[in-house]
Amino acid sequence: MKKQFRLWLTACSAFFVAGHSVFLSSCNDDLPAASYYTFTGEMMSDYLKSREDFSLFARIVERAGEMDFLASRGGRTLFPPVNAGVEDFLKEYGYASVEDIPEAYCDTLVKACMIDNSIVYTYNLTETSQQKNELDLPLVIQTTGDTVDANGMVLSIVNRRAAIINELKNDSVENGVCHPVSKVLVPSTSL
């Protein structure tokens, strides 16, 4: 009986070791370099970083801690102000530089010019269109034909403050669309 028990125990141990060697061994995934995928698309964060005319707004986005969000997947619409618009904002509100804007207000400024989960192209807009920004405040876009740029093209005005720059509008990126504007969109509840 003892001999049968040892034989049975030895057989079970052998099966146990053999079984675990199958489950505990790892596979070798040495794939050729051509098999790996490298994303090469441009996200909103890349759009801001790669264009010198958005360097001041890109710094506001960095200070707000939102650059990673603009690098993430999704579908959003961004109205980034050009450097001249940011400089006008700094003068208007008494800031010497972007670094003087409180970080919490930087976050507010970024969210004021962003529509998340919605891609809005200007050619889909009616004469007056209203969207909610990230602060849940209205972005009113008026394209009435009353205001034209130097080339005679009709301008779209956002919140009666900033004009969408016609030469740069509807610029698609992997995670949405950018409509550069002439001024910083400040949050407002009275439109």
Q: What spans do the regions from the language model cover?
A:
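Sec-dependent bacterial lipoprotein signal peptides
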Residues: 1-26
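Second-shell loop/turn segments in exported
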Residues: 41-48, 93-99, 167-168
